[in-house]
Amino acid sequence: MTGKIIKGIAGFYYVYVEETKEAKETATGGTLYECKAKGTFRKQKIKPLVGDTVDIAVLDEEKHIGNVERILPRKNELIRPAVSNIDMALVIFASAKPDPNFNLLDRFLCMMEYQHVPVTICFNKKDLITPQKQQELKSIYEPAGYRVMFTSTKTGEGIDEIKHVLEGRTTTVAGPSGVGKSSIINCLQDDVQMETGHISEKIERGKHTTRHSEIIPIKDGTYIMDTPGFSSMDVPGFEKEDLWTCYPEFVEYEPYCRFQGCSHINEPDCGVKEALSEGKISQVRYDNYKLLYEELKNRQKY
């Protein structure tokens, strides 16, 4: 039997098995199995991750207890958060109240770029800003190649568009507190079958439990992962020299730099700074680049 690990805690792995075609007429959704991992994984120094697709052996069908027998090949593996098989990241910030922290947003974008995960940006609380402000926010991130969406959990605007973007994917959802992330997740769960509520109860999902990464089945083939905080840039191997490669809009202009290994800060004849002066790169993004570069530089000293 094959399923997906949706939560791992204290040596137990909770594996969600989607409903079978035969069971569709009577079942209310998939089934959750509480599993332990076989000792062979420990010997091979392999740790199952949230997001893994696994084969399980059922030990007790009535109590839904089993063993993880095999981990199927991973499409990708994120270091922070430690999860696998992610198709996309959805990062949620408020349009206002609180105003978006662009430095924090750019940190997250860099982390995902470094780990090769496509990102969609969602600005919630659309009802609090003008169309002009929406355009301002778009102008910072759309030139960098990011999809920018606006939602309002108050009016319901944009929620269907988000559902469409998430469909058929496993998406990690992140965002600081106070931006309406939980409200959006609740809206996305409107269509979730009854069994998922039971699953949430079984794995003790609560309002303040995002200390652990956890996958929420939305419907068969569509999953979202509620992700803990992301302010740290502590990804092994991530150095200041890598930072510019995590700014997609810099990559286009880097070949025009006079010096190889240009940091795009102090060097003359820099293609990136030239693009900045021509308004092709956002000043907000560039200012954050300099701050993050300095932070990584200082970290390397120690």
UniProtKB/Swiss-Prot annotation:
Free-text comment on the cofactor: Binds 1 zinc ion per subunit.
EC number: 3.6.1.-
Example of a GO cellular component annotation carried by this entry: cytoplasm
InterPro entries: G_CP_dom, NA-bd_OB-fold, P-loop_NTPase, Ribosome_biogen_GTPase_RsgA, RsgA_GTPase_dom, RsgA_N
Keyword rRNA-binding applies: yes
A GO BP entry: ribosomal small subunit biogenesis
Chief localization: cytoplasm
Residues the record lists as binding GTP: N124, K125, K126, D127, G175, P176, S177, G178, V179, G180, K181, S182, S183
Keywords: Cytoplasm, GTP-binding, Hydrolase, Metal-binding, Nucleotide-binding, Ribosome biogenesis, RNA-binding, rRNA-binding, Zinc
Molecular function terms, GO-annotated: GTP binding; GTPase activity; metal ion binding; rRNA binding
Broad class of enzyme this protein falls into: hydrolase
Cross-referenced PANTHER family: SMALL RIBOSOMAL SUBUNIT BIOGENESIS GTPASE RSGA, SMALL RIBOSOMAL SUBUNIT BIOGENESIS GTPASE RSGA 1, MITOCHONDRIAL-RELATED
Assembly: Monomer. Associates with 30S ribosomal subunit, binds 16S rRNA.
Name of the protein this chain belongs to: Small ribosomal subunit biogenesis GTPase RsgA
Species this protein is from: Agathobacter rectalis (strain ATCC 33656 / DSM 3377 / JCM 17463 / KCTC 5835 / VPI 0990) (Eubacterium rectale)
Lineage, top ranks: Bacteria, Bacillati, Bacillota, Clostridia, Lachnospirales
